[in-house]
UniProtKB/Swiss-Prot annotation:
Belongs to the bacterial ribosomal protein bS20 family. It comes from the Bacteria. Binds directly to 16S ribosomal RNA. This is Small ribosomal subunit protein bS20. SUPFAM superfamilies: Ribosomal protein S20 (SSF46992). PANTHER family: 30S RIBOSOMAL PROTEIN S20, SMALL RIBOSOMAL SUBUNIT PROTEIN BS20C. One of its GO terms (cellular component) is cytosol. GO terms for biological process: translation. Keywords: Ribonucleoprotein, Ribosomal protein, RNA-binding, rRNA-binding. It comes from Klebsiella pneumoniae.
């Protein structure tokens, strides 16, 4: 039973982690393109997602802080 639960949690966490990375990549892509408005919009969308994943324990709070600091 534990193995089945672990596999389910692993897939769920992988999905959430992938989603978070995608939002972070969108911010970097907007910055690379030089579009300040799009970068700000992408950053504002990314922030609560990263915060939520850190609160749930998917990533460490310091990693959350590092992502946000590097992109501001």
């Amino acid at each position: 039973k534990r193995a089945v639960q672990s596999e389910k949690a692993r897939k769920h966490n992988a999905s959430r982690r992938s989603m978070m990375r995608t939002f972070i990549k969108k911010v970097y892509a907007a910055i690379e393109a030089g579009d300040k408005a799009a970068a700000q919009k992408a950053f504002n969308e990314m922030q609560p997602i990263v915060d939520r994943q850190a609160a749930k324990g998917l990533i460490h709070k310091n990693k959350r802080a590092r992502h946000k600091a590097n992109l501001t």
